[in-house]
Amino acid sequence: MHARKILQSAAVLALSAALTLPAGPAQAAAGPNTDFNGDGYNDLAVGSPSYPGYPGTKNSGLVAVLFGGPDGLTYNRHIIRPAPGCTAGGLPCEAWGVNLSAADVDADGRTDLISRGHYDLQVDSWTSQGTATIERRVYGHRTAPWRLMSGQFDDQPGTDIVGPTRGGYWFSVGGWYNRSANLLFTDFADDSYLTKETSAASGDLDGDGKLEIAVVAGRHSGAGELGPHLWLIDDPHRPQVQLTTLGSPSTCTSPPSYGQGCPKADSEVAMGNVNGDGHDDLVMLTPSTASLQVWYGRATGPSSAPGYTVDLSSLATSAELGPGLAVGDVNGDGWAEIVIGASKATVSGHSEAGAVMVIPGSATGPVIKRAQLVTQDGIGPVGGTALADPIAEQSKPGDRFGQAITITDLTGDGKGEVIVGAPAKNGGSGMLAVLFGSATGVLTSTAQAIHPSRYGLNSTQAYFGGVLLK
């Protein structure tokens, strides 16, 4: 028999008005191209920065590339890990897989994997001849992009590898532009001294073909008020980087009100096309206020205020929410779903077993009343009883199901799979759950439960599923 399911208050139905779903979204958003081996199916990269190294080495970490197919993740995999004796700047290589990104770095028409450790970064490329590391960069621990992002960020040809970088007491944005060998950071236009970067995401909000960066960070000094801010950065390569403020302490009310951005130190951001208009939208989850906010993209850039705000406290407590957050089209209708993790949620009496909520998108934004609640014990409507249990596992205390989430179309059917990490499961070895996309949302008849032992990874220090490529 199945364990008792989470029951959520029916009051969630009052969180949003009834929304109609007009046809004709401008653009689907099933997820990025992560087909590394060129077989027509997207693949998944999983970072395991705490994985033990070879005998006599530190916990040097690794990256497992798991290949997709018509039935989901296959048994085929490629493991990237430091070789014995690997050093970076005179220090042992460690924490490989702490951050991941993907882009066509060498302009050969095929997606490459970018992964970093504490002191180094490398780009791996797949060709018909096999896999090769085409770039390797060594840097100091305090000059590494904390969140890897890759793609076209400036107006010059070539792939950029950039991200927010956290130093001892400072924060900046920069990296390698257009395959340059030089690491470049530019100053902020208002001479701000920023610190405590907590989350970042990239996407094309204005539809100009270049990516923007959204980042949650604290302002320590400089022009403006102190405290957590949500900033939008357009072209971080430009001298004197411009910061567009979308939220700050002065825009916060309690509880968060419609039309006001309210970033906190625990806010998480992601991007995707929620309303199907061809522009990415900026989504922010703030666990401490149990709120979800969306800034809609448009040709002139997003409005300074969110176009959608909702109180999530009827779905989960603030202590349960986060940090998992992903945006992508699960049902193939052209409107991206928002998937929220509640990794510390109590499920079937088990503390911190974890759950995720899949919130459909529409032409008018998220549709909270049609959300699905997913645990290892079942799937069903929020506020109701689970109707099916496709995951061949049960919730256990401390699993942290929903700690990390990504949405990728592994099967090639135009519908994104929701891939959920439970990194603390089975004593820390971890697990992935692949929830298949379907026309009605997450498929309730079948799912994949992926254990690292399937790929020869048997350490209880793997925390498999804690870092996922987005």
Describe the residue ranges of each PLM region.
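Bacterial N-terminal signal peptides that target proteins for export
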Residues: 1-11
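Blade-edge motifs of beta-propeller repeat domains
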Residues: 13, 17-30, 67-95, 123-147, ...
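An edge-strand/N-cap motif at the start of beta-rich repeat modules
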Residues: 27-79, 86, 100, 162, ...
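Beta-propeller blade termini
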Residues: 29-41, 97-105, 146-154, 159, ...
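Acidic/hydrophobic-patterned starts of short beta strands in beta-sheet-rich repeat architectures
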Residues: 38-47, 107-116, 155-164, 207-216, ...
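Hydrophobic strand positions within the blades of repeat-based beta-sheet folds
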Residues: 44-46, 63-66, 96, 113, ...
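Short glycine/acidic-enriched loop and turn motifs that connect beta-strands
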Residues: 50-55, 120-121, 167-169, 219-224, ...
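A detector of repeated loop/turn-to-beta-strand junctions in beta-rich toroidal repeat architectures
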Residues: 57-62, 120, 225-229, 289-291, ...
